[in-house]
Amino acid sequence: MKTMNQIVGENLKKTRELSGFTQEQVAKSIGVERSAYSNYESGVREVPFHLLEKIADLFGCEAFLLFEDNVEADNEILATAFRISD
C-alpha cells in the first residue's frame, strides 16, 4: 500500500512532466532547492501544505487532486496539464 507521501509525489511528478516543467523550474517557482522538490516527488519528504497550494497554483489545479490515488484524479491531472501547455 502506498503512503500519502508517495501518492502526492507520484501526482507531482506526473503533473510536472505533463506540463513540461523541470524539477528546477518548479523548485524555483515555489522557493525551495531542487533537491528538496525531488524528495517531495519521490515521497521521501512530506510537502508542506503552503507549498502544495503554490504548486497547485503553478499547475492550475486544485490542491486536493494531488492527494488522489485513482483514475479520475489522473484524468483531471491530464486535463490540467493540457490546459497549461496550450
Language-model regions: role of each:
Residues 10, 20-21, 47-50:
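Residue-level signal for the short linker/turn that defines the boundary of a DNA-recognition helix
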Residues 33, 44, 70-74:
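The DNA-recognition helices of helix-turn-helix-type DNA-binding domains
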